């Protein structure tokens, strides 16, 4: 479906949009023909109801509400079962809903007779279908039937690529259909739930607006035209990004799917069943609730703690079947829990103590210096456990140890300074804190003050490439992760349990050698004693325990099993409730955007093959560079203050990134001082800067050659003089011109003629005579044989070519994105056809296999098991890195006193294991193995006046098609991939890293905790947990453990491939790929349709053409200008092409007259650009003497490579030839001969 759903409809003009204030249905009701059957009744009913309910607000009459009796009279006119709609309508009008806004009213009015419900077999609405532009369209993932007697019987065409299906709309319904538009500038649009914002190429809505069941709804502009159809949504924090179908200006359908999108079709309701003992019940309708039977309700939750519908059961247990708002406002999941006292390491920054605000854990994974704190107190609840926004509750340290409450103003949080509290819920606080070495939570009231300090280093954090202490007011927004301040979000679960009852010494009294159980007023307590025999009992008044003489022989406690507490190691696990519950961990770590500073842009000074960056910043800013060739040579440096950095730039280019600025790519031009067409010293100066080594070698060679030539000439002259004068030295007074004597000594030599040679062979070797004579005859015979064999082939080929539908053209295109390759297709009998192939994009797509994911782990230390006067035994457990150990001779002591009546026969079973961190979903790394890579390119092909875009795999096999065009590309000349065999992906960044294999964990190293996915149950780990013997002062579980290998890897991961990849590759993920790598050449075979060619008789015929270059600057841009003067037989379009790789023309086709001139622009990298240009097939040569460019550095890559024959100017060659064989050489030789003659003709006696 290359044209989407509207191939035929895109060419007709859109009908004029209907005005919003004039209801279209009422205006057209009179002239419409009467419809027969059920469809007509439904249409009339829909029109009437819409006019009464919605159109009332738009009528041009006084805004009086319609009397209720008239609405009731209209209701019975609905099809059978009138009572059911009545009750439904009454139910809808009972809640006091806010009045719909203007955008909602408009959407509702337009959707009234154009949008249809899609229902499943049970009659539930699961999505929508809409009538638009002569078609009825429905999302493919909405599996149901359109609630319309006619539309439900239509045959739909499916398109899985766009997740849509469509059918032709009946003719009598087309006038009521929507129209669509491809124009959607940034701003706000309308849909069923209000406003939709379009920005950055995405449609977004506030979170919580819209959801399942909204698939298929339209998004409309203010004119009522559809700009998009909603398919689903992806939660992105405070807003939801919509997955939509839109259309471009050519009518082609475009599907936009944000990452993490969920389809918004309403799933069929499946009743989940939960268990209580052997009895099953629907999870959303438990047999009891917490307010009625707290203990039994907790039993139900604990038994179904691992059920997939646990959240549904938890909500049902809390709601108790009540629909009143007062109930929902005070009942919360933390109503099931209670605060507790825990052992704090530093109370008031000094000594350990039992604290009501013991800090259990601190998370600091957010990028905005926000921390999440878990304590033993509860925030947002009053003393009774009801939700109260301005209160908190805590376990009192006083003798009664009851739950107390206070105002949230008493809660203070600090690190190295005060923190700002952002949100709170249950055991958790969310605060933004300055850096520090510890975290302190304090309760400061007028009566008392208590605090707890946890040693935890809070490091200053920043995102981006510039360090800052405080986020700027103005700057740039980049992706980051923050804690969601909404209390309703969940980051996972925390484990809860009902602890063993705490024994309080205050419940026992010793008097006169007797022990008494002394319960608080109106409370029951249970005592256990070992006074010879084991004794136990439950009393409500002061009672003597017979046989006991000391308090240490007994323990007494209150039994309350109606509350959960956090599974803290400071509490004792209950023997009867080993099952655990779980509650949601609030304040999820979510992706967001953070404001970061942007350093002052560098002052860039361009030089010859180098740039200087003058940098000035008042905070640490990162500067990274890499070369865009085969050897990237990446550099990284943090800079502060004023400084200058110099970098060499070559033809391949250099990329530098300064702070949070966008990457900048620069390329060196072959600019140089001097003039390649000037005097010798200017030529030497020019080439010395461009090619210093070769220039030095050439000048040195020329100098040496001249010195050798002069030296040899002088020596030869001396020797000739000596040799010639020697014979006359014996003849006294001889005067003879020596030059004449030398000339006489030279013998003449002439080659024999053909006749003399043949006569000699006939006389001396007749066989060779005949062989010599047969050579021309043999050549003639071979030539005739070849012609006789080729003639039938040429005849058959010519007949076959006349029948084919396409002409195949093969060429090789450089794999350099955005650089066009141009060719001229010359076909016998047809006019030349210009062909331009541009690699718009390229992707190296490796096949990958995810080995595992890893992230920061959380150590879970459950409440220990205590056995008084006995021993325990460890049992195996299905947890990652599970460690268990039993310690004997312990003396458990808590804030209520001793918990056992034995001194040393007690035992404690300590356990510990690890889990994925609650923030692992937002901060984890993928360990991936990379295998064979495939390559895909996006091509832009222009032939004649036709432009086509297509994607094709570069494997030499798989064809790519676009309309009548067929292309086969590859294989590429050189295989390349920037990825090693093992890579790690973390937050969109890719690292080549040799990670450990799955199952080969090492404590403190990358991969110390591994899972195949974030939701899998196959978690394995090795963190070297070692349990230690607890001390007697309090109940606790001491242990040691290796630090997180994931955190250590993050701090030493090095630079990602995005900054170090060769060939200028851009690395992307989801899927893993390398984009726009400039390397290699791609062979391409293209079948050009016959319709693209023009017969020679129909094309202009250029008889003469002449090229004159008016201006030429060799550079990366089109710096040359040439004028082609021509004579043609007719007016028309002519292809113009450069047949030399020395120059590339900017134009592909020009308009010619019968006689005239056209100007073309060309790009060359050579100072002497001599290239052949053809106009309508007529060729001529352009000779250009190009000047060096003024700009040393440019931002565009070169379009041509320099060739040897064009690298040296014609003037340089002239000077070089003149040096060795021109007039100067002749002059030197003449002078030498003259000198020799003078010496030889001189007389000596």
UniProtKB/Swiss-Prot annotation:
Site keyed Cleavage: positions: 264-265, 328-329, 751-752, 806-807
Domain Peptidase S3 positions: 114-264
Glycosylation sites noted in the Swiss-Prot or TrEMBL record: 278, 524, 646, 945, 1051
Residue span of region Host transcription inhibition: 37-70
GO molecular function terms noted in the UniProt entry: RNA binding; serine-type endopeptidase activity; structural molecule activity; ubiquitin-like protein ligase binding
Signal sequence, renumbered to the chain: none
Biased composition (Polar residues): 38-49
Residues in coiled coil: 682-730, 1196-1245
Annotated protein name in UniProt: Structural polyprotein
Annotated source species: Sindbis virus
Classification lineage: Viruses, Riboviria, Orthornavirae, Kitrinoviricota, Alsuviricetes
């Amino acid at each position: 479906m290359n044209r989407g759903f509207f191939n035929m409809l895109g060419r007709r003009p859109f009908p004029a949009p209907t005005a919003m204030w004039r209801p279209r249905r009422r205006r057209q009701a009179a002239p419409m023909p009467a419809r027969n059957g059920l469809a007509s009744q439904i249409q009339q009913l829909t029109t009437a109801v819409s006019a009464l309910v919605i159109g009332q607000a738009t009528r041009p009459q006084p805004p009086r509400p319609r009397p209720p009796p008239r609405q009731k009279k209209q209701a019975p006119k609905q099809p059978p079962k009138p009572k059911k709609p009545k009750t439904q309508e009454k139910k809808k009008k009972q809640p006091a809903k806010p009045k719909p806004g203007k955008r909602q009213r408009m959407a509702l009015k337009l959707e009234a007779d154009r949008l249809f419900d899609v229902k499943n077999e049970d009659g539930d609405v699961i999505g929508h279908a809409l009538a638009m532009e002569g078609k009825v369209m429905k999302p493919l993932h909405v599996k149901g039937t359109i609630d319309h007697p006619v539309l439900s019987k239509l045959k739909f065409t499916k398109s899985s690529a766009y997740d849509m299906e469509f059918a032709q709309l009946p003719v009598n319904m087309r006038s009521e259909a929507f129209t669509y538009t491809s124009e959607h500038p940034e701003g706000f649009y309308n849909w069923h739930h209000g406003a939709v914002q379009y920005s950055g190429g995405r449609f977004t809505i506030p979170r919580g607006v819209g959801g399942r069941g909204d698939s298929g709804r339209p998004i409309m502009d203010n004119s009522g035209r559809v700009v998009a159809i909603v398919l689903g949504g992806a939660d992105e924090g405070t807003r939801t990004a919509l997955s939509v179908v839109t259309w471009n200006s050519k009518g082609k359908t475009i599907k936009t799917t944000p990452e993490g999108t969920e389809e918004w079709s309403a799933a069929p309701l499946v009743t989940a069943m939960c268990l209580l003992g052997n009895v099953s019940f629907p999870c959303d309708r438990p047999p009891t609730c917490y307010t009625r039977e707290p203990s039994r309700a907790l039993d139900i939750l604990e038994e179904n703690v691992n059920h997939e519908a646990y959240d549904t059961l938890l909500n049902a247990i809390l709601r108790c079947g009540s629909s009143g708002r007062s109930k929902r406002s005070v009942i919360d999941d933390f109503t099931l829990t209670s605060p507790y006292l825990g052992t704090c390491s530093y109370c008031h920054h000094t000594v350990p103590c039992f604290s009501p605000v013991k800090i259990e854990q601190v998370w600091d994974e957010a990028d905005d210096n926000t921390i999440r704190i878990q304590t033993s107190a509860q925030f947002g609840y009053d003393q009774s456990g009801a939700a109260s926004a301005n209160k908190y509750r805590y376990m009192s340290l006083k003798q009664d140890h009851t739950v107390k409450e206070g105002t949230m103003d008493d809660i203070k949080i600090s690190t190295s300074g005060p923190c700002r509290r952002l949100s709170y819920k249950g055991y958790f606080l969310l605060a933004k804190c300055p850096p520090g070495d510890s975290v302190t939570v304090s309760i400061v009231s007028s009566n008392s003050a208590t605090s707890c300090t946890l040693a935890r280093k809070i490091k200053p954090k920043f995102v981006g490439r510039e360090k800052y202490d405080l986020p700027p007011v103005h700057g740039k927004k980049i992706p980051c992760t923050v804690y969601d301040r909404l209390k309703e979000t969940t980051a996972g679960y925390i484990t809860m349990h009902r602890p063993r009852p705490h024994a309080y010494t205050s419940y026992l009294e010793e008097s006169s050698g007797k022990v008494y159980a002394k319960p608080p007023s109106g409370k029951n307590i249970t005592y256990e004693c070992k006074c010879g025999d084991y004794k136990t009992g439950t009393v409500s008044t002061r009672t003597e325990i017979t046989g006991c003489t000391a308090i240490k022989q007994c323990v007494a406690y209150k039994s309350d099993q109606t509350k959960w507490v956090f599974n803290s190691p400071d509490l004792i696990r209950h023997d009867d409730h080993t099952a655990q519950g779980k509650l949601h961990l609030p304040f999820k770590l979510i992706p967001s955007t953070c404001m970061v500073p942007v350093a002052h842009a560098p002052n860039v000074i361009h030089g010859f093959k180098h740039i200087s960056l003058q940098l000035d910043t008042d905070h640490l800013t990162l500067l990274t560079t890499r070369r865009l060739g085969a050897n990237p040579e990446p550099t990284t440096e943090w800079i502060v203050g004023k400084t200058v950095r110099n970098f060499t730039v070559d033809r391949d280019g250099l990329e530098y990134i300064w702070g949070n600025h966008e990457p900048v790519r620069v390329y060196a031009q072959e600019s140089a001082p001097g003039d390649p067409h000037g005097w010798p010293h200017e030529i030497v100066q020019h080439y010395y800067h461009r090619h210093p080594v070769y220039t030095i070698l050439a000048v040195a060679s020329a100098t040496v050659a001249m010195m050798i030539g002069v030296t040899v000439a002088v020596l030869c002259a001396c020797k000739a003089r000596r040799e010639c004068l020697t014979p006359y030295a014996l003849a006294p007074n001889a005067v003879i011109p020596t030059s004449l004597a030398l000339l006489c000594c030279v013998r003449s030599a002439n080659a024999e003629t053909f006749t003399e040679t043949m006569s000699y062979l006939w006389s001396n070797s007749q066989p060779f005579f005949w062989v010599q004579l047969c050579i021309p005859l043999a050549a003639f015979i071979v030539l005739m044989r070849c012609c006789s064999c080729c003639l039938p082939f040429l005849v058959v080929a010519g007949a076959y070519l006349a029948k084919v539908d396409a002409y195949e053209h093969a060429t090789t295109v450089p794999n350099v994105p955005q650089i066009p390759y141009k060719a001229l297709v010359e076909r016998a009998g047809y006019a030349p056809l210009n062909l331009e192939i541009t690699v718009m994009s390229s992707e190296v797509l490796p096949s990958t296999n995810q080995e595992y994911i890893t992230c920061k782990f959380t150590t879970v230390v459950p409440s220990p098991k205590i056995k008084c006067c006995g021993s325990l035994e460890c049992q195996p457990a299905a947890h990652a890195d599970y460690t268990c150990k039993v310690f004997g001779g312990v003396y458990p002591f808590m804030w209520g006193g001793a918990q056992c009546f034995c001194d040393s026969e007690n035992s404690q079973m300590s356990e510990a294991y690890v889990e994925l961190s609650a923030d692992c979903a937002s901060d984890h790394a993928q360990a991936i193995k990379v295998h064979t890579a495939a390559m895909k390119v996006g091509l832009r092909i222009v032939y004649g006046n036709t432009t086509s875009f297509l994607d094709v795999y570069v494997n030499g096999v798989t064809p790519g098609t676009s309309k009548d065009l067929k292309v086969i590309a590859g294989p590429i000349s050189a295989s390349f991939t920037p990825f090693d065999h093992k890579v790690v992906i973390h937050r969109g960044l890719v690292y080549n890293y040799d990670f450990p294999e799955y199952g080969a964990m090492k404590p403190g190293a990358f991969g110390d905790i591994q899972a195949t996915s974030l939701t899998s149950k196959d978690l394995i780990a090795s963190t070297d947990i070692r349990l230690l013997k607890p001390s007697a002062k309090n109940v606790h579980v001491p242990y040691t453990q290796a630090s997180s290998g994931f955190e250590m890897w993050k701090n030493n991961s090095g630079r990602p491939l995005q900054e170090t990849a060769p060939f200028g590759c851009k690395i992307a993920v989801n899927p893993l790929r390398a984009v726009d790598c400039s390397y290699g050449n791609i062979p391409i075979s293209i079948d050009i349709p016959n319709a693209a060619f023009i017969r020679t008789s129909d094309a202009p015929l250029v008889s003469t053409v002449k090229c004159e270059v008016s201006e030429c600057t060799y550079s990366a841009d089109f710096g040359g200008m040439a004028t082609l003067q021509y004579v043609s037989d007719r007016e028309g379009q002519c292809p113009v092409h450069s047949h030399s790789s020395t120059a590339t023309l900017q134009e592909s086709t020009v308009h010619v007259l019968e006689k005239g001139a056209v100007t073309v622009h060309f790009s060359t990298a050579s100072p002497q650009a001599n290239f052949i240009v053809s106009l309508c097939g007529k060729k001529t040569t352009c000779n250009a003497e190009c000047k060096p460019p003024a700009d040393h550095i440019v931002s565009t890559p070169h379009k041509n490579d320099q060739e040897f024959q064009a690298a040296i100017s014609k003037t340089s060659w002239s000077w070089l030839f003149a040096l060795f064989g021109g007039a100067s050489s002749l002059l030197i030789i003449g002078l030498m001969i003259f000198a020799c003659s003078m010496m030889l003709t001189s007389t000596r006696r």
